[in-house]
Amino acid sequence: KASLFVTCIVDQLYPEVGVSVVRVLRRQGVDVDFPQGQTCCGQPVYNSGFTGQARLLARRVLSTFAESRYVVVPSGSCAAMMRVFYPELFKDDPALLRQAQELSAKVYEFSEFLVKVLGVEDLGVSNPDTATYHPGCHQLRELEVRDEPLKLLRQVGSLELRDLPHAESCCGFGGAFSVKFPHISEGMLSDKVKNVMSTGADTL
């Protein structure tokens, strides 16, 4: 059994991603639940220096997922906040630190959960397209989830997976970074788009 942490972006902009995650997990025999009390993980306010507000949101998440066996997150950024930075937020509060460490141990990014916990690399799907893969920065650098998405993609039948030049370079989004430094963000995105287009892939 696993609990889905839906993330703000999935909830507000891409709900179909959440639906797809649930479908994939259920096809693998996972009983998925969706704790109703969940809210933002607190990363945007934490990255903006508002640690007090971040703690309030984090405490809500700790309480909401306290009984979950696994917490599956379709976002490297949110998963990193919960796994890496919640213990840092509560390092001076022994009781909450223990709760943060307990949650940290059961938080998994989606592809990581499939490969590491379920032991699944072949989902039994096919797609006769060409694709290239961009690894998200938080997923790559903070969670160290590097190979799991590629293992899954390489098992997609008929899919031609093309290498992305400078794949590990940031796309320029970085959450609040793109708002605080829009011109730098646009430049980084421009470089990323050029590299993606150079592959000739149908899908990113």
Residue ranges and their predicted role:
Residues 1-203:
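Iron-sulfur cluster-binding electron-transfer modules in prokaryotic oxidoreductases
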